[in-house]
């Protein structure tokens, strides 16, 4: 099948869903353009910052469009491209966009409270503590993985200490990324003091992007993975503590232009070349490497269809910058359906890169996607080196924009975990743990530790934890909508399905890890071998976290069900 046809069908479905279902949700729940948002009421120059709607959209999209939509869609294609396409469209429209929009809506209607604080208000303090602990652990895993991914992308040296073939490309992309950070601060200061909006801020963004690439192409930084890892963690520390307007928002605004260029380049490549989808339509309900289609397909696709992490961005940062409630639809629902389109494009690029017999191209999903789009740019007459640097930068930016967002969210989750109502008079250890800089340091230290002891051992749990997080958010939205007298029937189908998917995946993972440990012990211990210890560490860590996630998830679901059962519509509670 022609990949262009697939992309066009997806684009029509997603745009139609935004115009019809998204607007229906907005009308059903109630949008008040005249209401003062938390960004206006609680403006503090750090987290609560009134911001133009499209700038908030850029922040939301660039924060949620991380590694997931590309990696997940391509990996899940092992079951065939049709199941992936169907789940991305159905999941994005009725699951992911509803969750993101709902989380943003609930937060804005509650003074910009994060999801943890919303759970305390509508479910209880115990549920809040459990949820915040779950979120903090989840953020640590994401920080470790994405930081390692970024450092590996810019790495110029191989395992033998020699320069790799792509050293100049990687070094140039690294320098471009650093210049992005520098120009983002300059951009933020210009916006703050000169109040640039509309076409003026867009022109400035493009100028700074061009300057970043000019500097990067001429002055590449050749460093190893360890050095880039330190640089990455230093950057995300500042991104987590500095005011949103100074670094995070302007960088997201600039990055969005790159994402748009990447997506447009991929689409134009599909239009001009209209390559055939070489991946098989359907390979069966079981895959030798991944397992059974249910629940693995849903967990693997992850962010391209639905993601709990998105709700943390919606309620943790975006809700504190929305200036007008009418912007919530495009920020919450619109950013998610655009990410679903990115997942479809990634699937089609991988399909175009596959061999005629359906064999997937060599390399990681990111490498497959990067090479595919870079080849389109070269076909348009762009220089090979520039195309490679641009796509390497895009790949790293996908991870970096999610990384700095999750670092801030992890810091906030940690602070909320130990905070009390009267923090102004808090003393001792509680005041220290809730300090912005100290809580950020501990959060990043946890993520950094995971990169050193082997985050890869627990990364397989990311998909399940991410989807479970979305189910917990949906459960909270059910209670919120009921208490405030709003319709919540559209929440039940995705909630029930995601609970079934995530707990099944976690139990399957738990059983697999127990078998791996016991089988290794049965073979190696009698033979006097010492390799069992390594197997136990790798799988034991996953086992502990899987049990912890299941216990936390079940407890939160129990408290949510109890709160929903006891909740009554209170006309005074409507916000």
Which residues are covered by each model-predicted region?
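Membrane-helix boundary/coupling elements in multi-pass transport proteins
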Residues: 67-74, 91-99, 103, 107-111, ...
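Transmembrane helix-loop junctions in multi-pass membrane proteins
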Residues: 2, 69-70, 82, 141-163, ...
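Membrane-interface "cap" regions at the ends of multi-pass membrane proteins
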Residues: 16-70, 256, 292, 296
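Extracellular/periplasmic helix-exit of transmembrane alpha-helices
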Residues: 101, 270-284, 337-372
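Loop-to-transmembrane helix boundary motifs in multi-pass membrane proteins
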Residues: 125-140, 334-340, 385-387, 416-452
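Membrane-interface loop-to-helix entry segments
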Residues: 16-30, 134, 171-215, 225-272, ...
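Extracellular loop-to-transmembrane helix junctions
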Residues: 2-19, 76-107, 116, 174-184, ...
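Flexible loop linkers connecting adjacent transmembrane helices
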Residues: 23-49, 72-75, 85, 89, ...
């Amino acid at each position: 099948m022609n990949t262009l046809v697939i992309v066009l069908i997806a684009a029509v479905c997603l745009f139609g869903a935004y115009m019809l279902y998204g607007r229906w949700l907005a009308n059903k729940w109630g949008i008040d353009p005249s209401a003062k948002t938390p960004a206006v009421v609680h403006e503090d120059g750090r987290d609560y910052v009134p911001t133009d709607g499209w700038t908030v959209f850029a922040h939301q999209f660039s924060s949620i469009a991380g590694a997931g939509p590309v990696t997940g869609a391509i990996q899940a294609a092992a079951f065939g491209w049709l199941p992936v396409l169907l789940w991305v469209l159905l999941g994005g429209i009725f699951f992911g966009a509803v969750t993101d929009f709902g989380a943003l809506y609930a937060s804005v209607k509650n003074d910009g409270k994060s999801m943890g604080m919303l759970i305390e208000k509508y479910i209880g303090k115990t549920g809040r503590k459990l949820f915040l602990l779950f979120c903090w652990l989840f953020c640590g895993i994401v920080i470790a993985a994405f930081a390692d991914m970024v450092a590996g992308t810019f790495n110029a040296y191989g395992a033998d200490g020699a320069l790799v073939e792509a050293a100049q490309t990687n070094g140039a992309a690294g320098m471009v990324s650093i210049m992005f950070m520098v120009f983002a601060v300059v951009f933020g200061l210009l916006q703050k003091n000169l109040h640039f909006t509309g076409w003026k801020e867009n022109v400035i963004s493009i100028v700074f992007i061009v300057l970043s690439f000019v500097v990067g192409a001429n002055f590449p930084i050749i460093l190893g993975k360890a050095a880039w890892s330190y640089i990455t963690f230093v950057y995300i520390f500042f991104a987590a503590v500095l005011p949103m307007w100074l670094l995070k928002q302007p960088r997201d605004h600039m990055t969005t232009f790159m994402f748009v260029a990447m997506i447009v380049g991929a689409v134009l490549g599909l239009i001009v070349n209209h390559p055939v989808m070489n991946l098989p339509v359907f390979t069966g309900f079981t895959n030798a490497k991944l397992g059974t289609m249910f629940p693995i397909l849903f967990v693997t696709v992850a962010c391209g269809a639905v993601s709990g992490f998105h709700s943390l961005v919606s309620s943790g940062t975006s809700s504190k910058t929305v200036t007008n409630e009418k912007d919530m639809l495009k920020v919450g629902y619109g950013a998610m359906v655009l990410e679903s389109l990115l997942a479809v494009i990634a699937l089609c690029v991988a399909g175009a890169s596959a061999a005629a017999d359906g064999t997937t191209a060599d390399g990681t999903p990111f490498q497959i996607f990067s090479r595919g789009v870079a080849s389109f740019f070269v076909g348009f007459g762009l220089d090979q080196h520039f195309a490679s640097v641009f796509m390497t930068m895009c790949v790293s930016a996908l991870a970096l924009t999610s990384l700095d967002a999750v670092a801030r969210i992890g810091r906030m989750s940690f602070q909320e975990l130990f905070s009390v109502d009267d923090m102004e008079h808090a003393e001792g250890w509680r005041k220290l743990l809730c300090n912005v800089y100290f809580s950020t340091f501990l959060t990043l230290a946890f993520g950094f530790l995971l990169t050193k002891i082997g985050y890869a051992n627990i990364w397989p749990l990311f998909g399940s934890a991410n989807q479970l997080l979305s189910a917990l958010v949906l459960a909270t939205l059910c209670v919120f909508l009921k208490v405030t007298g709003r319709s919540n029937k559209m929440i039940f189908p995705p909630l029930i399905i995601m609970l079934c998917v995530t707990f099944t995946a976690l139990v399957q993972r738990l059983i697999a890890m127990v078998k791996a440990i016991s089988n290794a012990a049965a073979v190696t211990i009698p033979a006097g071998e010492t390799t069992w210890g390594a197997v136990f560490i790798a799988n034991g860590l996953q086992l502990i976290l899987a049990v912890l996630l299941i216990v936390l998830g079940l407890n939160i679901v129990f408290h949510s069900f109890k709160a929903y059962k006891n909740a009554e519509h209170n006309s005074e509670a409507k916000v």
